[in-house]
Curated annotation (Swiss-Prot):
The keyword Translocase does not apply. One of its GO terms (molecular function) is dephospho-CoA kinase activity. This is Phosphopantetheine adenylyltransferase. It comes from Pyrococcus furiosus (strain ATCC 43587 / DSM 3638 / JCM 8422 / Vc1). Disulfide bonds: none annotated. One of its GO terms (biological process) is coenzyme A biosynthetic process. NCBIfam families: CoaD_Thcocales, cyt_tran_rel, PRK00777.1. It catalyses: (R)-4'-phosphopantetheine + ATP + H(+) = 3'-dephospho-CoA + diphosphate. It is found in: Cytoplasm. Reversibly transfers an adenylyl group from ATP to 4'-phosphopantetheine, yielding dephospho-CoA (dPCoA) and pyrophosphate.
Length: 160
């Protein structure tokens, strides 16, 4: 089946791969023949909530590769990124960026940076936010805080 785009990009920390990450990656592979995945460096995540609980880059990389292999995704490149723009201005032939509603602003910044260099802006493919059983968005921050699991289920605390 012909894909809409030849080369697409998606990026993130991908800490404790959850349903939201998986939906984002699935959409990227659904629309793109080749998927470039920007994986944030350890240095870039220092300002994130509960950053001390974020898994190291190498562990996040292995978890990401495992997900890609289990789902038989083959046409991808994972590249370490050190800022929000990453390699999106270096690969001129990129055609689209896949983001969630929450990270749409990042896609706008990427396009601004590309346009400043005379590059074609990327089409922006947006997926909806995936909600937990509590009704809030599934996020790595909530998982790191011990409030939900990667499937969006609340974590029950033992009463004392």
């Amino acid at each position: 089946m012909k894909k809409k785009y030849k080369k697409v990009v998606v990026g993130g920390t991908f800490d404790r791969l959850h349903l939201g990450h998986k939906a984002l990656l699935r959409k990227a592979f659904e629309v793109g023949e080749i998927v470039y995945i920007g994986l944030t460096s350890d240095e870039m995540i220092k300002e994130k909530q509960y950053s001390e609980r974020i898994l190291p880059y190498e562990k996040r990389l292995l978890d990401l590769i495992k997900f890609l292999e289990v789902n038989k995704y083959r046409n991808y490149r994972i590249m370490k990124i050190h800022n929000a723009i990453g390699f999106t201005t270096k690969i001129k032939s990129l055609e689209a960026i896949v983001v969630s509603e929450e990270t749409y602003k990042g896609a706008v910044l990427v396009n601004k940076a590309r346009e400043e260099l005379g590059l074609r802006p990327l089409d922006i493919v947006v997926i909806p936010i995936i909600r937990s059983r509590l009704g809030c968005k599934i996020s790595s921050s909530l998982i790191r805080a011990g409030l939900i699991d990667p499937f969006g289920n609340p974590i029950r605390r033992e009463e004392k």
